[in-house]
Amino acid sequence: MLKLRYKILFMKKINWVAGLVVLVVFSGCFDTVEEVTVADNGSGTFVNSLDMGKMLGLAKTMGSGKDEMKDFDKLKMDTVINLKDIKDSLKNLNAAEKNIAATGKLRIQMDANDEKMNFSFSFPFSKTSEIDGIQNILKKAKQNIIGDIMQKIMGEEGGKNESMLGNEDGDEKKDDMGANIDEYYTSVYEKGKFTRKLNKEKYAHVEDDKSLKSLQEMAQLGMAINMKTIINLPKPAKKAEGKGLKLSDDKKKITMEGTLDDFFEDASYFEYNIEY
């Protein structure tokens, strides 16, 4: 039986629907899309999206037949939240990082009946070198942000209940949300050049990464974890090298798609060298 990282305690004081939603959000089993759009002057937007639809469908199957599912199927929303409104609650960020986080927005789209659940973070940047900082902030605060939002949406039962998120005293430190493979690569975003190179020394110990290994087990059970990167350039690419890269006809859009299995089979698949 696959052991989930985040414990869900369906006690009487915890609303069943809220518990099920938290299970979906913090299971880590979801698809991710990162999209970078660069304007002529070097500014642009960075978007990180989490698609939890597959896990939501599995959760519905698990709860099939329960009376509470009638309430669960009614969950529906499409809302945008300015992160500046919650920046003070991001305790794991310093003051400078909070100011950057405050420039971002989070769009939540949920329709339980249609098995749709998406979280999409969007941040502006004035130059491409700022992308790395935005990614680091999301790595540190994404779970905290979504937990805070889930608490507001679901009430006291959602999001930040310590026992639900496996953060009681004595519990091991919470892992990052989802399949975070970025730490195994060195990425550089310069004017006119983007590169991503595998850290072979770190990757040699990937089998010790308990979080990724547990997600790999999920994938082997039929819950494939897809990862997609899209880069929209202001001009045609002069160079676009990488095993997983696809270049549009006008050479301005670069797409890379792969799975967690691809990462374990050949991590160089996610390397790239782009010049424009």
What is each residue range found by the language model?
Residues 7, 17, 35-36, 42-44, ...:
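A generic structural micro-environment signature
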Residues 15-21:
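Sec-dependent N-terminal signal peptides
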Residues 25-28:
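C-terminal motif of bacterial Sec signal peptides marking the signal peptidase cleavage site
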Residues 88-276:
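Mature, soluble, non-transmembrane domains
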Residues 1-15:
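Positively charged n-region of N-terminal signal peptides that target proteins for export
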Residues 30-104:
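Start-of-domain marker
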